[in-house]
Each structure stands twice: as C-alpha cells, then as structure tokens.
C-alpha cells in the first residue's frame, strides 16, 4: 500500500509495507487516519487499540525503535546563481579601503583608471561583489533560494578568483615590478590591464538540503555563446617619469657614441654596450675617451626626473629651439600641461620648447580625469647658448660674433666627458678620438645629444627649431703645436656638434665648417 500526501510539496510522506517515511509536518493527520481505521474494527479490544496507538507514536522521526522504519532527510531545491552577462561587472578590487567595480560606477572597462605615484600593485585586493536577489525576478541581485532558506551568514557565496596584470601588448607584468611600475616604459606599454576571472561560483544556505548550488564557470552570451566569467580593467599610475630630449625622439639610434678599443677612430655604430677601453662597457662613462651614459640617463627614455647622481634637473643648459618631452606615467594625452614661464611653451603632449633666455621654469602636468592628481617639474638654466648659422675661417672671427655678456665657451662647457675636456693639449696633433657622455651638467652636447637643425647627408634632424648646424664649433681655448712644416703655431680647439668630439682645425682640413656658438650665464 502506498500513501502519498502532496508529492509536489517540499515535505511529503510515503507509507509502504515495512518501510515508513513520515513528514514532521503531517504527524497529526497520520495519527487521525490510523485511529479512524482501528475504530472501524469493532472486535478490537482496548489493549489492541492502545497498542496500535503506541506503535504509531513510536514511529516518530526522532525515534529509531522500529528496525523496519527508515527516516530520510527532507529534500528541497538547490539555491541558484544566475549567470547573466552582467555579472562580470561585479568583479573588481579593493585598493586603500575603496571598492572598485563597474557596477558601482567608479571604474569602467573602456577607460583608463589612474592611481597616484605611491601605488603598489601588490596592494590591490581582488574581489567579487555578488549580492542576493530580494525576489526571483530581481535583476539587481545574483543568487536566490526558492525555498527561502537563509543564506550561510559566514559564506553565502564562494568562488575562485584568478587575476593577471598585463601591459597593453599583453606582456605579463613581472611581480618584481609591482611596487614601481609607473615609469617602466622600457619594459611595458601603458596603460596596464588587470584581468580578473571567476570560476566555481557556488551559493550556500544555512540549513537547506541541498544547501549548495551547482558550480558556475561560464556565462551564456547572445553573440558568442558560453564565455568565461572575465573582466578586464585598464589601470595606469600617474607620475612624472623622464625628461626626454627631442634628439632621442627624432633619432633614437644615436643616443651615445663610443671609441674603438684600439682608439683608431670612433665606433661607427652608436648605442653600443660591449666591453670598451680599459674594460669599461661602451654604454658606461669612460673618462679616458668619454662615451656612454651616466646613471641619470635611461636608454630610450632620457633623463630621470629624480636624478641619481646630479643635484640638478635636466636641462641646465638651453638654446632657442631646444625641446624635450616631460614623459608621464600612463598615456601623455591623459594629462594637461601648463607652464609658469612665458619664455617657454608646452604642447598637449608635454613637449617643452625653450624660446628665450630664462632662469627657472616649472611645468605642471594635471590628470584630466582627476585634477587633484598633478605633478610639477622644475628646472633651472645656468647657461644660454646662441649658435651662429655662418662659418668662420678663424677663432678671432668667431669670437667677434659674441657681444655683450656672451662669449665663446670652453670645451668643458660644450663637452665635459673625458680627460680631453680639461687636460693640456699642447703638442697634440692630428685626430684624437673622444665623444660626449650623456649626463646632466656634462656640457651642452652631453645634455642635448647630437644637435642638428636640418638634414646633413644621412643624418636626421634632431632640433628643427634651433640654429645648430653640422660642423665644428670654436671654443675660447687654443693649444700650442707645430704645423706640417714643423713651425710653432697656436691653434684653436674645436668641439663637434655631432658627437661632442674635441679636436683641432688642422685635423679636419678646410672642408668641414667651423662655426661660432656664444654663451651667457644666467
């Protein structure tokens, strides 16, 4: 015999021979039913009537006295997590006590979110922000229990969150760079991407059976079918990073030069890094011949805004048409650039142009999306130069071009990179090979690099708004030597605008132009 009470209900009972399952909620109705059956049997004695009642009472779910009775747990519906397309917007992170996710509106996937220069990627705590539905049709929520079971107060929902930091070219960020990522332009293309993926999403109730939902690992999209539950945000760290001379922007292949190990001539190729003279790498300063860069210069980026060696910021020298870019963390176009000095201009990309002699200049970069984040870069010029366009046959004619407080400069003011910048060159003849070292305060050509206002043979223009031409520039110094007839002469000392080489007119003949550059201390 089978007796079923409301089989569609969460609680129901079945009555079978030797197998009795009874609902906690329907004990009273079963008891009345059994008593009615017994009363119909008029031959039953009081004892048998009482025995039957006692036998029924012993079938309480809390009582296991009957060996033929099995009590099963009460079954209901599983809680449900709704894997809609919008749930990816509830993946986010907490940083410095603030929660960020697209559903809250303080970050979106299609724009770059900036944080200030103190940001450490290790401090981002990846989180999900799923909430329960108040009703089954509440689209603002993400999970529901149709039987109204209470959710587990300690862990109503669980999931596995994986994340990865990448740059704009999908290069994975090395965790070693997490604490200083803003100015890692040589390693990563900005902005960064934070990719968050949720798997094994489950809902948990406190008492229900079952008390856990099926795991969710995908969402069904209308256009692409099943897709992983992944959200990607664009992140950038605001900061001032580099002061980048325009010569580096226009011609990155000629950042520094070196001298061949046998000193027979300068290396034809620039930017070399192998072992050089005196076992010093060719990209490091070498006082014997110059060349390489100081610790204040970063390959392909220019000078650090916070120098390691120098106590001053780049530049300390200037000329009309000198240009450099203030390189920022993130994307240049995300900032507004202004200056406090009318003698210089700065464009929308942070490209600064020096127009007139001036002493101290401050450039301010303000984040467009948050004007509370802004940075000042201040530099002070010590020396202002005026290169002359024409060439001159001798040092005296060149000197005559400098009037007032201006004058021809010393070799160390143009290139102070090697022993040839200051040593006595009396008796020297021919070509002595040496070049500039890129460093702040190492002279005009050491700061600004190869200087040229128009193309010369295959050489690319580096400062188009300046008056620098290819050639040799007279200094205010000379040395005693002899000519081809072994006659004693006094000869001017020159410096090349191409690579800062210090030399003499007789070493290069009359075919290469000799020019004048006048300087004034500010």
Regions found by a protein language model. Name each.
Residues 59-68:
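Sec/Tat signal peptide C-region and signal peptidase I cleavage site
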Residues 444-522:
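Extracellular C-type lectin-like domains
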Residues 72-160, 168:
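Long, solvent-exposed N-terminal ectodomains/accessory regions
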Residues 147-346, 351-354:
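Extended, non-transmembrane interaction/recognition domains
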Residues 385-477:
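Conserved hydrophobic ligand-interaction patch in extracellular adhesion modules
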Residues 1-42, 285-287:
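N-terminal secretory signal peptides that target proteins for export/translocation
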Residues 305-338, 345-414:
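Extracellular adhesion/carbohydrate-recognition regions
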Residues 66, 256-257, 261, 268-288, ...:
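Short, structured beta-strand segments at or near domain termini in extracellular proteins/domains
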């Amino acid at each position: 015999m089978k007796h079923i009470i409301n089989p569609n209900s969460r609680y129901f009972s079945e009555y079978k021979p030797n197998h009795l399952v009874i609902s906690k909620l329907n004990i009273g109705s079963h008891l009345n039913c059994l008593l009615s059956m017994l009363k119909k049997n008029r031959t039953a004695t009081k004892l048998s009537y009482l025995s039957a009642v006692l036998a029924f009472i012993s079938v309480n779910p809390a009582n296991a006295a009957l060996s033929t009775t099995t009590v099963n747990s009460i079954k209901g519906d599983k809680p449900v997590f709704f894997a809609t397309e919008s749930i990816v917007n509830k993946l986010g992170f907490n940083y410095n006590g603030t929660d960020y996710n697209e559903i809250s509106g303080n970050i979106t996937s299609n724009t770059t979110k900036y944080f200030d220069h103190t940001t450490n990627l290790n401090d981002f705590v990846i989180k999900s922000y799923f909430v329960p539905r108040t009703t089954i049709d509440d689209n603002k929520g993400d999970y529901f229990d149709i039987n109204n079971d209470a959710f587990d107060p300690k862990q109503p929902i669980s999931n596995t969150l994986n994340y990865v930091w990448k740059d704009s070219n999908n290069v994975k960020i090395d965790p070693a760079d997490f604490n200083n990522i803003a100015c890692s332009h040589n390693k990563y293309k900005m902005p960064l991407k934070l990719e968050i993926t949720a798997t094994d999403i489950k809902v948990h109730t406190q008492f229900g059976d079952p008390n856990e939902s099926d795991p969710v690992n995908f969402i069904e999209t209308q256009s692409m079918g099943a897709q992983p539950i992944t959200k990607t945000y664009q992140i950038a760290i605001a900061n001032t990073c580099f002061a980048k001379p325009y010569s580096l922007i226009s011609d990155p292949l000629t950042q520094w030069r070196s001298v061949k190990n046998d000193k027979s001539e300068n290396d034809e190729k620039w930017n070399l890094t192998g072992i050089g003279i005196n076992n010093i790498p060719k990209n490091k300063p070498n006082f014997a011949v110059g060349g390489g860069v100081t610790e204040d210069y970063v390959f392909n980026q220019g000078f650090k805004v916070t120098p390691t060696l120098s106590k001053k910021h780049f530049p300390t020298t200037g000329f009309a048409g000198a240009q450099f870019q203030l390189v920022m963390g993130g994307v240049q176009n995300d900032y507004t650039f202004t200056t406090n000095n009318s003698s210089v201009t700065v464009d929308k990309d942070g490209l600064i142009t020096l127009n007139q002699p001036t002493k101290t200049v401050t450039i301010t970069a303000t984040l467009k999306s948050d004007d509370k984040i802004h940075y000042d870069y201040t530099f002070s010029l010590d020396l202002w130069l005026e290169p002359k366009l024409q060439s001159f046959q001798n040092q005296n004619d060149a000197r005559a071009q400098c009037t007032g407080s201006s004058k021809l400069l010393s070799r160390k003011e143009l290139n102070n990179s090697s022993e040839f910048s200051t040593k006595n060159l009396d008796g020297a003849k021919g070509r002595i090979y040496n070049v500039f070292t890129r460093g702040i305060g190492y002279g005009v050509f050491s700061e600004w690099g190869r200087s040229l206002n128009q193309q010369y043979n295959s050489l690319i223009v580096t400062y188009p708004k300046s008056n620098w031409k290819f050639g040799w520039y007279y200094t205010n110094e000379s040395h005693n030597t002899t000519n081809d007839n072994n006659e004693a002469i006094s000869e001017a000392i020159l410096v090349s605008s191409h690579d800062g080489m210090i030399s003499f007119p007789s070493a290069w003949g009359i075919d290469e132009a000799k020019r004048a550059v006048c300087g004034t201390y500010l």
